[in-house]
């Protein structure tokens, strides 16, 4: 993904601490205080320009959403959507997914969305894939006992890799769609990438994976 440089992005993000939380470590285990309720928390890793998370928040006011994006020049687009919509159940983080356990306590998150993650196709970059086992270990920690992961991609190789990685780690595959837009799934909210890829006729792959059963 080629990113357009926006040198003003960090300053704009800093100007809206009510939307882009500047100190997520201080919120660890206390995100419900920020939202002012005990509703479940869903996070999107790689929230991009924010179309998915803002639309989901409108459709599901009974859920709190946190979008995580590494690149400030991308996150400002999500911030603009949040400023315009003033959705009370969305917050954003300009952060790296490697630090998830610094931001969220064990069992604090009900669902993780991985939408069109970078597939990092080269073998030497395997550890960067968001479904590599080291990332799955982070997800396992922050997910609640009945928590799950929802993944979508147009990259067949990455999808197949993810299914194997999730299964080997112990996640339970609860749903697998090999052609999402020709399936019977209801209520699918598309991301910017999903609209772009599906318009080209690309097949969209999707799966749901339940957190590994815990030893009693």
Swiss-Prot record:
Organism superkingdom: Bacteria
GO MF: tRNA (guanine(46)-N7)-methyltransferase activity
Active site per UniProt: 118
EC number(s) from the headed UniProt entry: 2.1.1.33
Key word Ribonucleoprotein present: no
Family (UniProt): Belongs to the class I-like SAM-binding methyltransferase superfamily. TrmB family.
Pfam family, one: Methyltransf_4
Pathway the protein acts in: tRNA modification; N(7)-methylguanine-tRNA biosynthesis
Binding site for S-adenosyl-L-methionine: 44, 69, 96, 118
Assigned GO CC terms: tRNA methyltransferase complex
Enzymatic reactions: guanosine(46) in tRNA + S-adenosyl-L-methionine = N(7)-methylguanosine(46) in tRNA + S-adenosyl-L-homocysteine
Keyword ATP-binding (UniProt): no
Annotated substrate binding sites: 122, 154, 191-194
The protein's name in its UniProt record: tRNA (guanine-N(7)-)-methyltransferase
HAMAP family, alphabetized: tRNA_methyltr_TrmB
Keyword terms, alphabetized: Methyltransferase, S-adenosyl-L-methionine, Transferase, tRNA processing
CDD domains: AdoMet_MTases
InterPro entries for this protein: SAM-dependent_MTases_sf, tRNA_(Gua-N-7)_MeTrfase_Trmb, tRNA_methyltr_TrmB_bact
Stretches for region Interaction with RNA: 124-129
Function of the molecule: Catalyzes the formation of N(7)-methylguanine at position 46 (m7G46) in tRNA.
């Amino acid at each position: 993904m080629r990113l357009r440089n926006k040198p003003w992005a960090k300053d704009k993000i800093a100007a809206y601490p009510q939307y882009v939380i500047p100190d997520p470590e201080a919120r660890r285990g206390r995100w419900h205080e920020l939202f002012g309720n005990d509703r479940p928390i869903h996070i999107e890793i790689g929230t991009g320009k924010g179309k998915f998370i803002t639309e989901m928040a409108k459709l599901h006011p009974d859920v709190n959403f946190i979008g995580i994006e590494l690149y400030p020049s991308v996150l400002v687009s999500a911030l603009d959507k949040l400023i315009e919509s003033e959705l009370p159940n969305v917050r954003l983080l300009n952060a790296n997914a490697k630090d998830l356990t610094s931001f969220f306590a064990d069992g604090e998150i009900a669902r993780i969305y991985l939408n069109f993650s970078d597939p990092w196709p080269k073998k030497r970059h395997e550890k960067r894939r968001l479904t590599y086992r080291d990332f799955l270990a982070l997800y396992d920690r922050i997910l609640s006992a009945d928590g799950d992961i929802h993944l979508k991609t147009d990259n067949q190789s990455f999808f197949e890799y993810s299914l194997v990685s999730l299964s080997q780690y112990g996640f339970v595959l609860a749903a697998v769609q090999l052609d999402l837009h020709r399936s019977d799934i209801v209520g699918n909210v598309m991301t910017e990438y999903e609209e772009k890829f599906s318009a080209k006729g690309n097949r969209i792959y999707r799966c749901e994976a339940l957190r590994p059963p815990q030893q009693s």
